[in-house]
Protein backbone atom coordinates (compact mmCIF):
# COMPACT_ATOMS: atom_id res chain seq x y z
CA UNK A 1 0.00 0.00 0.00
CA UNK A 2 1.19 3.51 -0.65
CA UNK A 3 0.04 7.11 -0.48
CA UNK A 4 -1.60 8.07 -3.75
CA UNK A 5 0.66 10.47 -5.67
CA UNK A 6 -2.34 11.99 -7.44
CA UNK A 7 -3.81 13.21 -4.15
CA UNK A 8 -0.74 14.45 -2.32
CA UNK A 9 0.24 18.05 -3.14
CA UNK A 10 3.85 17.76 -1.94
CA UNK A 11 4.47 14.65 -4.04
CA UNK A 12 2.91 16.24 -7.13
CA UNK A 13 5.18 19.27 -6.81
CA UNK A 14 8.19 16.95 -6.48
CA UNK A 15 7.13 14.92 -9.52
CA UNK A 16 6.37 18.09 -11.44
CA UNK A 17 10.03 19.13 -11.33
CA UNK A 18 11.09 15.75 -12.69
CA UNK A 19 8.54 14.84 -15.29
CA UNK A 20 6.32 17.44 -16.92
CA UNK A 21 4.88 16.82 -20.38
CA UNK A 22 2.73 18.85 -22.78
CA UNK A 23 -0.54 18.04 -24.56
CA UNK A 24 0.10 17.90 -28.31
CA UNK A 25 -3.20 16.44 -29.52
CA UNK A 26 -6.76 16.02 -28.20
CA UNK A 27 -9.28 13.66 -29.83
CA UNK A 28 -12.33 13.49 -27.57
CA UNK A 29 -11.35 11.58 -24.41
CA UNK A 30 -7.92 10.65 -25.85
CA UNK A 31 -4.85 12.84 -25.29
CA UNK A 32 -1.42 12.63 -26.92
CA UNK A 33 1.25 13.95 -24.56
CA UNK A 34 4.92 14.72 -25.34
CA UNK A 35 7.53 14.22 -22.60
CA UNK A 36 11.25 15.15 -22.45
CA UNK A 37 13.61 12.48 -23.86
CA UNK A 38 14.29 9.70 -21.35
CA UNK A 39 11.35 10.72 -19.15
CA UNK A 40 8.60 8.57 -20.68
CA UNK A 41 5.90 7.36 -18.24
CA UNK A 42 5.06 3.67 -17.95
CA UNK A 43 1.90 2.08 -19.35
CA UNK A 44 -1.03 2.56 -16.88
CA UNK A 45 0.66 5.52 -15.13
CA UNK A 46 -1.76 8.24 -14.02
CA UNK A 47 -1.24 11.66 -15.62
CA UNK A 48 -2.72 14.84 -14.13
CA UNK A 49 -3.41 17.79 -16.46
CA UNK A 50 -2.34 21.25 -15.28
CA UNK A 51 -4.49 24.33 -15.87
CA UNK A 52 -3.41 27.59 -17.47
CA UNK A 53 -1.71 29.04 -14.38
CA UNK A 54 -0.04 25.73 -13.46
CA UNK A 55 -3.05 24.90 -11.31
CA UNK A 56 -4.10 21.26 -11.17
CA UNK A 57 -7.30 20.49 -13.09
CA UNK A 58 -9.67 17.65 -12.23
CA UNK A 59 -8.64 15.73 -15.36
CA UNK A 60 -6.70 12.52 -14.69
CA UNK A 61 -5.64 10.30 -17.59
CA UNK A 62 -4.18 6.81 -17.85
CA UNK A 63 -1.33 5.98 -20.24
CA UNK A 64 -2.43 3.35 -22.76
CA UNK A 65 0.14 3.47 -25.57
CA UNK A 66 3.74 4.58 -26.15
CA UNK A 67 3.73 6.11 -29.64
CA UNK A 68 7.44 6.82 -30.20
CA UNK A 69 9.03 10.28 -30.65
CA UNK A 70 8.70 10.73 -26.86
CA UNK A 71 4.90 10.74 -27.05
CA UNK A 72 2.28 8.73 -25.16
CA UNK A 73 -1.43 8.26 -25.77
CA UNK A 74 -3.63 8.47 -22.67
CA UNK A 75 -7.36 8.03 -22.00
CA UNK A 76 -9.10 10.60 -19.79
CA UNK A 77 -11.14 9.51 -16.76
CA UNK A 78 -13.35 12.62 -16.91
CA UNK A 79 -14.55 15.15 -19.49
CA UNK A 80 -11.83 16.86 -21.53
CA UNK A 81 -13.87 20.05 -22.09
CA UNK A 82 -11.67 23.13 -21.80
CA UNK A 83 -8.35 21.37 -22.36
CA UNK A 84 -5.99 22.86 -24.95
CA UNK A 85 -2.79 21.90 -26.71
CA UNK A 86 0.28 23.06 -24.84
CA UNK A 87 -1.17 22.49 -21.36
CA UNK A 88 1.19 20.87 -18.87
CA UNK A 89 0.72 17.24 -17.82
CA UNK A 90 2.28 15.75 -14.67
CA UNK A 91 3.37 12.11 -14.66
CA UNK A 92 2.53 10.87 -11.16
CA UNK A 93 4.87 7.90 -11.59
CA UNK A 94 2.25 5.35 -10.48
CA UNK A 95 -1.12 3.91 -11.57
CA UNK A 96 -4.40 5.39 -10.35
CA UNK A 97 -4.63 4.64 -6.62
CA UNK A 98 -7.83 4.60 -4.56
CA UNK A 99 -8.60 4.68 -0.81
CA UNK A 100 -9.15 1.30 0.84
CA UNK A 101 -10.18 0.04 4.27
CA UNK A 102 -13.09 0.37 6.68
CA UNK A 103 -13.50 4.12 6.10
CA UNK A 104 -14.77 3.41 2.55
CA UNK A 105 -17.94 1.75 3.92
CA UNK A 106 -21.13 3.76 3.55
CA UNK A 107 -19.52 6.10 1.00
CA UNK A 108 -19.90 6.62 -2.76
CA UNK A 109 -16.77 6.96 -4.92
CA UNK A 110 -15.94 7.67 -8.54
CA UNK A 111 -13.34 5.80 -10.61
CA UNK A 112 -10.47 7.81 -9.04
CA UNK A 113 -11.57 6.93 -5.50
CA UNK A 114 -12.82 10.46 -4.83
CA UNK A 115 -15.99 10.61 -2.66
CA UNK A 116 -18.99 12.05 -4.53
CA UNK A 117 -21.60 11.94 -1.73
CA UNK A 118 -20.88 15.40 -0.22
CA UNK A 119 -19.91 13.82 3.13
CA UNK A 120 -16.38 15.21 3.15
CA UNK A 121 -13.01 13.52 2.53
CA UNK A 122 -12.38 9.85 3.34
CA UNK A 123 -10.61 9.38 6.66
CA UNK A 124 -7.75 7.17 5.48
CA UNK A 125 -4.17 7.47 4.24
CA UNK A 126 -4.12 3.90 2.94
CA UNK A 127 -4.48 3.62 -0.81
CA UNK A 128 -3.89 0.87 -3.33
CA UNK A 129 -3.21 0.89 -7.10
CA UNK A 130 -6.08 -0.38 -9.27
CA UNK A 131 -3.72 -2.43 -11.48
CA UNK A 132 -2.45 -5.51 -9.66
CA UNK A 133 -1.62 -9.09 -10.51
CA UNK A 134 -4.05 -11.88 -9.68
CA UNK A 135 -3.10 -13.89 -6.55
CA UNK A 136 -0.38 -16.47 -7.17
CA UNK A 137 -1.54 -20.07 -7.54
CA UNK A 138 0.09 -21.04 -4.22
CA UNK A 139 -2.04 -18.40 -2.41
CA UNK A 140 -5.35 -19.73 -3.73
CA UNK A 141 -7.78 -21.67 -1.58
CA UNK A 142 -8.72 -24.63 -3.78
CA UNK A 143 -11.31 -26.14 -1.43
CA UNK A 144 -14.78 -26.25 -2.98
CA UNK A 145 -17.14 -24.85 -0.36
CA UNK A 146 -20.70 -23.57 -0.51
CA UNK A 147 -21.30 -19.90 0.24
CA UNK A 148 -24.49 -20.02 2.32
CA UNK A 149 -26.75 -17.04 1.60
CA UNK A 150 -29.73 -17.89 3.85
CA UNK A 151 -32.00 -17.66 0.78
CA UNK A 152 -33.74 -21.03 0.28
CA UNK A 153 -34.08 -21.09 -3.51
CA UNK A 154 -30.43 -20.11 -4.04
CA UNK A 155 -28.88 -22.42 -1.44
CA UNK A 156 -30.90 -25.47 -2.51
CA UNK A 157 -31.07 -25.26 -6.32
CA UNK A 158 -28.22 -23.02 -7.51
CA UNK A 159 -25.73 -22.75 -4.61
CA UNK A 160 -23.00 -20.14 -4.77
CA UNK A 161 -19.35 -21.09 -4.49
CA UNK A 162 -17.23 -19.34 -1.88
CA UNK A 163 -14.96 -17.15 -3.98
CA UNK A 164 -17.00 -17.92 -7.10
CA UNK A 165 -18.64 -15.79 -9.75
CA UNK A 166 -22.38 -15.68 -10.27
CA UNK A 167 -24.27 -14.21 -13.22
CA UNK A 168 -27.52 -12.44 -12.30
CA UNK A 169 -30.00 -12.28 -15.18
CA UNK A 170 -33.11 -10.18 -14.78
CA UNK A 171 -35.00 -7.33 -16.38
CA UNK A 172 -36.41 -4.24 -14.70
CA UNK A 173 -38.87 -4.65 -11.85
CA UNK A 174 -38.35 -8.34 -11.00
CA UNK A 175 -36.57 -7.75 -7.68
CA UNK A 176 -32.90 -7.63 -8.69
CA UNK A 177 -32.10 -4.68 -6.41
CA UNK A 178 -33.88 -6.21 -3.40
CA UNK A 179 -32.06 -9.53 -3.95
CA UNK A 180 -28.73 -7.66 -4.12
CA UNK A 181 -29.49 -5.77 -0.89
CA UNK A 182 -30.58 -8.96 0.92
CA UNK A 183 -27.32 -10.68 -0.06
CA UNK A 184 -25.37 -7.65 1.23
CA UNK A 185 -27.34 -7.79 4.50
CA UNK A 186 -26.99 -11.56 4.97
CA UNK A 187 -23.25 -11.71 4.29
CA UNK A 188 -22.72 -9.02 6.92
CA UNK A 189 -24.78 -10.88 9.54
CA UNK A 190 -23.89 -14.51 8.83
CA UNK A 191 -20.29 -14.19 7.65
CA UNK A 192 -19.14 -10.94 9.29
CA UNK A 193 -18.31 -9.79 5.79
CA UNK A 194 -18.70 -6.59 3.83
CA UNK A 195 -19.78 -5.77 0.30
CA UNK A 196 -18.58 -3.53 -2.51
CA UNK A 197 -20.98 -2.43 -5.25
CA UNK A 198 -19.49 -1.42 -8.60
CA UNK A 199 -21.96 0.42 -10.82
CA UNK A 200 -20.38 0.07 -14.26
CA UNK A 201 -22.04 2.16 -16.97
CA UNK A 202 -25.43 2.13 -15.26
CA UNK A 203 -28.05 4.88 -15.18
CA UNK A 204 -27.46 7.67 -12.66
CA UNK A 205 -31.11 7.34 -11.56
CA UNK A 206 -30.65 3.63 -10.76
CA UNK A 207 -27.50 4.34 -8.76
CA UNK A 208 -29.30 7.05 -6.80
CA UNK A 209 -32.32 4.79 -6.18
CA UNK A 210 -30.04 2.00 -4.92
CA UNK A 211 -28.28 4.40 -2.52
CA UNK A 212 -31.58 5.72 -1.13
CA UNK A 213 -33.02 2.20 -0.75
CA UNK A 214 -29.86 1.04 1.04
CA UNK A 215 -30.21 3.94 3.50
CA UNK A 216 -33.90 3.17 4.01
CA UNK A 217 -33.27 -0.53 4.67
CA UNK A 218 -30.28 0.05 7.00
CA UNK A 219 -27.60 -1.46 4.74
CA UNK A 220 -26.07 2.04 4.86
CA UNK A 221 -26.28 3.38 8.42
CA UNK A 222 -26.96 7.13 8.23
CA UNK A 223 -26.52 7.63 11.97
CA UNK A 224 -23.12 5.93 12.03
CA UNK A 225 -21.62 5.72 8.53
CA UNK A 226 -18.63 3.47 9.49
CA UNK A 227 -21.13 0.83 10.71
CA UNK A 228 -22.45 0.46 7.13
CA UNK A 229 -22.01 -2.84 5.31
CA UNK A 230 -21.25 -1.64 1.77
CA UNK A 231 -19.02 0.69 -0.25
CA UNK A 232 -20.37 2.04 -3.54
CA UNK A 233 -18.30 2.85 -6.62
CA UNK A 234 -20.08 4.41 -9.60
CA UNK A 235 -19.03 5.07 -13.18
CA UNK A 236 -22.28 6.09 -14.86
CA UNK A 237 -23.16 5.77 -18.52
CA UNK A 238 -22.76 9.54 -19.09
CA UNK A 239 -19.07 9.35 -18.16
CA UNK A 240 -16.21 8.89 -20.65
CA UNK A 241 -15.36 5.31 -21.68
CA UNK A 242 -12.08 5.43 -19.73
CA UNK A 243 -13.96 5.86 -16.44
CA UNK A 244 -16.46 3.10 -17.27
CA UNK A 245 -13.65 0.74 -18.26
CA UNK A 246 -11.74 1.25 -14.98
CA UNK A 247 -14.52 1.62 -12.38
CA UNK A 248 -14.81 -2.18 -12.06
CA UNK A 249 -11.10 -2.32 -11.14
CA UNK A 250 -11.62 0.45 -8.54
CA UNK A 251 -14.40 -1.55 -6.84
CA UNK A 252 -12.33 -4.75 -7.05
CA UNK A 253 -9.29 -3.04 -5.48
CA UNK A 254 -11.41 -1.98 -2.47
CA UNK A 255 -12.76 -5.54 -2.16
CA UNK A 256 -9.23 -7.03 -2.35
CA UNK A 257 -8.14 -5.01 0.70
CA UNK A 258 -10.99 -6.44 2.80
CA UNK A 259 -10.00 -9.95 1.64
CA UNK A 260 -6.21 -9.73 1.94
CA UNK A 261 -5.67 -7.37 4.89
CA UNK A 262 -8.87 -7.65 6.96
CA UNK A 263 -9.20 -11.37 6.05
CA UNK A 264 -12.94 -11.09 5.47
CA UNK A 265 -15.44 -12.69 3.12
CA UNK A 266 -16.37 -10.01 0.60
CA UNK A 267 -19.31 -9.78 -1.77
CA UNK A 268 -18.51 -7.85 -4.96
CA UNK A 269 -21.40 -6.71 -7.15
CA UNK A 270 -20.76 -5.57 -10.70
CA UNK A 271 -23.73 -4.04 -12.48
CA UNK A 272 -23.34 -4.40 -15.43
CA UNK A 273 -20.42 -6.52 -16.63
CA UNK A 274 -21.50 -6.00 -20.26
CA UNK A 275 -20.91 -2.23 -19.86
CA UNK A 276 -17.30 -3.00 -18.84
CA UNK A 277 -16.82 -4.81 -22.17
CA UNK A 278 -18.65 -2.05 -24.05
CA UNK A 279 -16.41 0.66 -22.56
CA UNK A 280 -13.33 -1.39 -23.48
CA UNK A 281 -14.63 -1.58 -27.04
CA UNK A 282 -15.01 2.21 -27.21
CA UNK A 283 -11.50 2.79 -25.83
CA UNK A 284 -10.05 0.23 -28.24
CA UNK A 285 -11.60 2.06 -31.21
CA UNK A 286 -10.35 5.43 -29.93
CA UNK A 287 -6.83 4.01 -29.67
CA UNK A 288 -7.02 2.90 -33.30
CA UNK A 289 -6.99 -0.87 -32.78
CA UNK A 290 -8.48 -3.09 -35.47
CA UNK A 291 -11.89 -4.36 -34.27
CA UNK A 292 -12.49 -8.08 -33.84
CA UNK A 293 -15.72 -10.13 -34.17
CA UNK A 294 -18.98 -8.09 -34.07
CA UNK A 295 -16.91 -4.91 -33.61
CA UNK A 296 -15.52 -5.82 -30.18
CA UNK A 297 -11.94 -5.10 -29.15
CA UNK A 298 -9.31 -7.71 -30.10
CA UNK A 299 -8.21 -7.79 -26.43
CA UNK A 300 -11.70 -8.76 -25.13
CA UNK A 301 -10.68 -12.08 -23.52
CA UNK A 302 -7.52 -10.57 -21.99
CA UNK A 303 -9.38 -7.61 -20.44
CA UNK A 304 -12.14 -9.84 -19.06
CA UNK A 305 -9.58 -12.32 -17.70
CA UNK A 306 -7.50 -9.62 -15.97
CA UNK A 307 -10.61 -8.56 -14.03
CA UNK A 308 -12.12 -12.00 -13.37
CA UNK A 309 -8.88 -13.74 -12.31
CA UNK A 310 -8.47 -11.29 -9.40
CA UNK A 311 -11.91 -12.32 -8.08
CA UNK A 312 -11.04 -15.47 -6.13
CA UNK A 313 -10.58 -17.15 -2.73
CA UNK A 314 -7.21 -17.03 -1.03
CA UNK A 315 -6.09 -18.52 2.29
CA UNK A 316 -6.89 -15.14 3.92
CA UNK A 317 -10.47 -14.63 2.71
CA UNK A 318 -12.71 -14.70 -0.32
CA UNK A 319 -14.29 -12.42 -2.90
CA UNK A 320 -17.58 -13.81 -4.15
CA UNK A 321 -18.77 -11.83 -7.15
CA UNK A 322 -22.32 -11.38 -8.39
CA UNK A 323 -22.41 -9.84 -11.84
CA UNK A 324 -25.47 -8.57 -13.66
CA UNK A 325 -25.20 -9.71 -17.27
CA UNK A 326 -26.96 -7.88 -20.10
CA UNK A 327 -27.38 -10.06 -23.18
CA UNK A 328 -27.58 -7.92 -26.35
CA UNK A 329 -30.62 -8.84 -28.45
CA UNK A 330 -30.97 -12.00 -26.31
CA UNK A 331 -28.09 -13.50 -28.31
CA UNK A 332 -26.12 -15.75 -25.95
CA UNK A 333 -23.48 -16.31 -28.64
CA UNK A 334 -22.56 -12.60 -28.70
CA UNK A 335 -18.83 -12.35 -27.81
CA UNK A 336 -19.46 -10.19 -24.70
CA UNK A 337 -21.82 -12.53 -22.77
CA UNK A 338 -20.09 -15.62 -24.23
CA UNK A 339 -16.75 -14.46 -22.78
CA UNK A 340 -18.44 -13.73 -19.43
CA UNK A 341 -20.11 -17.18 -19.24
CA UNK A 342 -16.70 -18.86 -19.41
CA UNK A 343 -15.88 -17.38 -15.98
CA UNK A 344 -19.21 -18.03 -14.17
CA UNK A 345 -19.74 -20.76 -11.55
CA UNK A 346 -23.50 -20.22 -11.21
CA UNK A 347 -26.37 -18.37 -12.86
CA UNK A 348 -29.35 -16.88 -11.00
CA UNK A 349 -32.21 -16.15 -13.40
CA UNK A 350 -35.03 -13.88 -12.23
CA UNK A 351 -38.43 -14.66 -13.76
CA UNK A 352 -41.05 -12.05 -14.58
CA UNK A 353 -43.71 -14.79 -14.44
CA UNK A 354 -42.89 -15.61 -10.80
CA UNK A 355 -42.76 -11.90 -9.90
CA UNK A 356 -46.24 -11.50 -11.43
CA UNK A 357 -47.49 -14.30 -9.14
CA UNK A 358 -46.07 -12.41 -6.15
CA UNK A 359 -43.43 -15.06 -5.43
CA UNK A 360 -40.32 -13.27 -4.18
CA UNK A 361 -37.42 -13.74 -4.59
CA UNK A 362 -38.51 -14.38 -8.20
CA UNK A 363 -35.61 -16.77 -8.89
CA UNK A 364 -36.50 -19.27 -11.62
CA UNK A 365 -35.78 -22.70 -10.05
CA UNK A 366 -35.51 -24.49 -13.42
CA UNK A 367 -33.41 -21.95 -15.35
CA UNK A 368 -30.92 -21.14 -12.57
CA UNK A 369 -27.82 -23.36 -12.58
CA UNK A 370 -24.68 -23.99 -10.55
CA UNK A 371 -21.52 -26.05 -11.04
CA UNK A 372 -21.58 -26.68 -7.26
CA UNK A 373 -24.72 -28.84 -7.41
CA UNK A 374 -22.84 -32.15 -7.51
CA UNK A 375 -23.08 -35.02 -4.96
CA UNK A 376 -19.32 -34.94 -4.21
CA UNK A 377 -19.51 -31.22 -3.28
CA UNK A 378 -22.91 -30.69 -1.63
CA UNK A 379 -23.50 -34.28 -0.48
CA UNK A 380 -26.00 -36.93 -1.60
CA UNK A 381 -28.87 -35.66 0.58
CA UNK A 382 -28.72 -32.08 -0.77
CA UNK A 383 -28.25 -33.24 -4.37
CA UNK A 384 -31.12 -35.76 -4.27
CA UNK A 385 -33.50 -33.23 -2.67
CA UNK A 386 -32.63 -30.56 -5.26
CA UNK A 387 -33.10 -33.00 -8.15
CA UNK A 388 -36.49 -34.19 -6.85
CA UNK A 389 -37.64 -30.57 -6.38
CA UNK A 390 -36.63 -29.77 -9.97
CA UNK A 391 -38.32 -32.92 -11.32
CA UNK A 392 -41.57 -32.06 -9.50
CA UNK A 393 -41.54 -28.47 -10.78
CA UNK A 394 -40.68 -29.62 -14.32
CA UNK A 395 -43.60 -32.09 -14.33
CA UNK A 396 -45.92 -29.31 -13.07
CA UNK A 397 -44.70 -27.08 -15.91
CA UNK A 398 -45.45 -29.83 -18.46
CA UNK A 399 -48.97 -30.32 -17.05
CA UNK A 400 -49.91 -26.64 -17.06
CA UNK A 401 -51.22 -26.67 -20.66
CA UNK A 402 -53.47 -29.66 -19.88
CA UNK A 403 -54.72 -27.96 -16.69
CA UNK A 404 -55.46 -24.73 -18.61
CA UNK A 405 -57.53 -26.59 -21.25
CA UNK A 406 -59.17 -29.48 -19.36
CA UNK A 407 -58.82 -28.56 -15.68
CA UNK A 408 -57.30 -30.41 -12.72
CA UNK A 409 -60.06 -33.04 -12.63
CA UNK A 410 -58.87 -34.64 -15.89
CA UNK A 411 -55.43 -35.46 -14.42
CA UNK A 412 -54.53 -38.84 -12.97
CA UNK A 413 -54.34 -39.23 -9.19
CA UNK A 414 -50.54 -39.27 -9.34
CA UNK A 415 -50.37 -36.10 -11.44
CA UNK A 416 -52.84 -34.31 -9.14
CA UNK A 417 -50.57 -35.14 -6.20
CA UNK A 418 -47.52 -33.87 -8.15
CA UNK A 419 -49.31 -30.59 -8.93
CA UNK A 420 -50.34 -30.10 -5.29
CA UNK A 421 -46.78 -30.68 -4.05
CA UNK A 422 -45.28 -28.51 -6.82
CA UNK A 423 -47.54 -25.61 -5.84
CA UNK A 424 -46.45 -26.00 -2.20
CA UNK A 425 -42.78 -26.11 -3.30
CA UNK A 426 -43.24 -23.02 -5.49
CA UNK A 427 -44.69 -21.09 -2.55
CA UNK A 428 -42.12 -22.44 -0.08
CA UNK A 429 -39.36 -21.12 -2.37
CA UNK A 430 -40.62 -17.62 -1.52
CA UNK A 431 -39.18 -15.96 1.57
CA UNK A 432 -39.59 -12.69 3.53
CA UNK A 433 -36.45 -10.51 3.26
CA UNK A 434 -34.86 -8.42 6.00
CA UNK A 435 -34.37 -5.45 3.68
CA UNK A 436 -38.04 -5.58 2.60
CA UNK A 437 -39.36 -5.37 6.19
CA UNK A 438 -39.92 -1.62 5.83
CA UNK A 439 -42.20 -2.24 2.82
CA UNK A 440 -43.99 -5.48 3.78
CA UNK A 441 -44.16 -5.32 7.57
CA UNK A 442 -43.13 -9.01 7.71
CA UNK A 443 -39.93 -9.80 9.64
CA UNK A 444 -37.11 -11.14 7.44
CA UNK A 445 -35.94 -14.76 7.69
CA UNK A 446 -32.49 -16.29 7.30
CA UNK A 447 -32.86 -20.04 6.64
CA UNK A 448 -29.84 -22.30 7.11
CA UNK A 449 -29.05 -24.91 4.45
CA UNK A 450 -29.87 -27.90 6.70
CA UNK A 451 -33.28 -26.39 7.55
CA UNK A 452 -33.95 -25.72 3.85
CA UNK A 453 -33.21 -29.34 2.88
CA UNK A 454 -35.35 -30.69 5.74
CA UNK A 455 -38.31 -28.52 4.70
CA UNK A 456 -38.32 -29.64 1.07
CA UNK A 457 -37.84 -33.29 2.06
CA UNK A 458 -40.99 -33.10 4.21
CA UNK A 459 -43.02 -31.64 1.31
CA UNK A 460 -41.71 -34.27 -1.15
CA UNK A 461 -42.35 -37.15 1.28
CA UNK A 462 -46.07 -36.32 1.41
CA UNK A 463 -46.12 -35.70 5.19
CA UNK A 464 -47.54 -32.21 4.62
CA UNK A 465 -50.05 -33.06 1.87
CA UNK A 466 -52.94 -32.15 4.18
CA UNK A 467 -51.78 -28.55 4.73
CA UNK A 468 -53.16 -25.69 2.58
CA UNK A 469 -50.69 -24.32 0.00
CA UNK A 470 -51.04 -20.73 1.25
CA UNK A 471 -49.41 -21.84 4.54
CA UNK A 472 -46.11 -22.20 2.65
CA UNK A 473 -46.15 -18.69 1.17
CA UNK A 474 -43.59 -16.17 2.49
CA UNK A 475 -42.36 -18.16 5.48
CA UNK A 476 -38.87 -19.07 6.70
CA UNK A 477 -38.39 -22.71 7.70
CA UNK A 478 -40.95 -25.53 7.48
CA UNK A 479 -41.96 -25.23 11.15
CA UNK A 480 -43.30 -21.73 10.43
CA UNK A 481 -45.36 -23.17 7.56
CA UNK A 482 -46.99 -25.80 9.83
CA UNK A 483 -47.66 -23.15 12.50
CA UNK A 484 -49.20 -20.88 9.85
CA UNK A 485 -51.40 -23.79 8.68
CA UNK A 486 -52.71 -24.25 12.24
CA UNK A 487 -53.56 -20.53 12.40
CA UNK A 488 -55.37 -20.74 9.04
CA UNK A 489 -57.50 -23.63 10.32
CA UNK A 490 -58.52 -21.67 13.40
Curated annotation (Swiss-Prot):
Stored CDD domains: ATP-synt_F1_beta_C, ATP-synt_F1_beta_N, F1-ATPase_beta_CD
Membrane-related topology note: Peripheral membrane protein
Keyword Transferase in record: no
Record's subunit section: F-type ATPases have 2 components, CF(1) - the catalytic core - and CF(0) - the membrane proton channel. CF(1) has five subunits: alpha(3), beta(3), gamma(1), delta(1), epsilon(1). CF(0) has four main subunits: a(1), b(1), b'(1) and c(9-12).
Role noted for this protein: Produces ATP from ADP in the presence of a proton gradient across the membrane. The catalytic sites are hosted primarily by the beta subunits.
Alphabetical list of HAMAP family matching this protein: ATP_synth_beta_bact
Entry's family note: Belongs to the ATPase alpha/beta chains family.
Protein's name according to its UniProt entry: ATP synthase subunit beta, chloroplastic
Gene source species: Ipomoea wrightii (Wright's morning glory)
